């Protein structure tokens, strides 16, 4: 048998099953102008998290009678805000046909319970307009500035004591997230600060989602689908090549490189 024959028998690819956690944008109304405004507000609160985010566009909850959806325009709105649509979830024939015309995969409607991602509004409030007195009226005394409450000694920490199952999404706004149990494939942990997992970490862990490059990820057993700090990430295919796979590790960010070290 020649060398060429041996090379032909050597497989150049493998088909593997995988459970990936993907963000779902569930459209409630066919109003692209309003979607553009609201999406811009969300992205402004966590720009690093929404950068090149893979997305499933769910159209199966759209109410009847809202008119034909302009799918190319909808995808362009998402693209402008860094959301990359991988597939469409739909049940209506016209939506399925529109997706197929764009060569987009179509997923069937889902009956699973999906938790919304709660990103709190961090935009500053507009100052109140100054009211000027009319001529002859006494000028009111300036209001005394309100005393601001003392800053907390530490950032708030969210503690989860039960296993985090596939499809669940937990977000620690403004602080750290501590999980005292296992995290299953398909689960997603997000925190503005650090993430600690005192058990096997098999889902996705995204720390510093608002851009904190000093955030860290700690876990007792690294088997994650994805780890990310301030928008810099590694997926399971990269993580499995690390000698730290399956071990207790500490993940930190140096420049734009994720470092994984043993605990």
From Swiss-Prot:
Region named Disordered: 107-160
Biological processes, Gene Ontology terms: cell morphogenesis; division septum assembly; regulation of cell division; regulation of cell septum assembly
Name of the molecule in the record: Probable septum site-determining protein MinC
Physiological role: Cell division inhibitor that blocks the formation of polar Z ring septums. Rapidly oscillates between the poles of the cell to destabilize FtsZ filaments that have formed before they mature into polar Z rings. Prevents FtsZ polymerization.
Quaternary structure, from the entry: Interacts with MinD and FtsZ.
Keyword terms of this UniProt record: Cell cycle, Cell division, Septation
Superkingdom of origin: Bacteria
Organism per entry: Pseudomonas paraeruginosa (strain DSM 24068 / PA7) (Pseudomonas aeruginosa (strain PA7))
Biased composition, class Basic and acidic residues, residue ranges: 112-150
Matching InterPro entries: CAP/MinC_C (IPR016098), MinC (IPR013033), MinC_C_sf (IPR036145), MinC_N (IPR007874), Septum_form_inhib_MinC_C (IPR005526)
Similarity comment: family membership: Belongs to the MinC family.
């Amino acid at each position: 048998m020649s060398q060429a024959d041996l090379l032909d028998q050597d497989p150049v690819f493998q088909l593997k099953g995988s459970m990936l956690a993907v963000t779902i944008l569930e459209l409630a109304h066919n109003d692209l102008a309003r979607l553009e405004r609201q999406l811009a507000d969300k992205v402004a609160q966590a720009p690093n998290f929404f950068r090149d985010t893979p997305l499933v566009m769910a159209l199966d909850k759209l109410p009847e009678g809202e008119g034909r959806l302009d799918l190319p325009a909808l995808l362009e709105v998402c693209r402008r805000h860094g959301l990359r649509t991988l597939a469409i979830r739909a049940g209506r024939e016209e939506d399925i046909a529109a997706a197929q015309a764009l060569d987009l995969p179509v997923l069937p409607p889902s009956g699973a319970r999906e938790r919304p991602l709660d990103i709190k509004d961090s935009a500053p409030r507009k100052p109140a307009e100054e009211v000027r007195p009319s001529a002859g009226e006494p000028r009111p005394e300036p209001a005394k500035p309100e005393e601001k409450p003392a800053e907390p000694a530490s950032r708030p920490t969210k503690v989860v004591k039960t296993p985090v199952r596939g499809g669940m999404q937990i977000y620690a706004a403004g602080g750290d997230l501590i999980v005292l149990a296992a995290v299953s494939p398909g689960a997603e942990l997000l925190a503005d600060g650090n993430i600690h997992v005192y058990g096997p970490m098999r889902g996705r862990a995204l720390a510093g989602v608002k851009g904190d490059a000093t955030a860290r990820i700690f876990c007792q057993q690294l088997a994650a689908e994805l780890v990310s700090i301030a928008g810099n990430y590694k997926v399971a295919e990269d993580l499995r090549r690390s000698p730290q796979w399956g071990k207790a590790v500490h993940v930190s960010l140096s420049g734009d490189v994720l470092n994984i070290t043993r605990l």
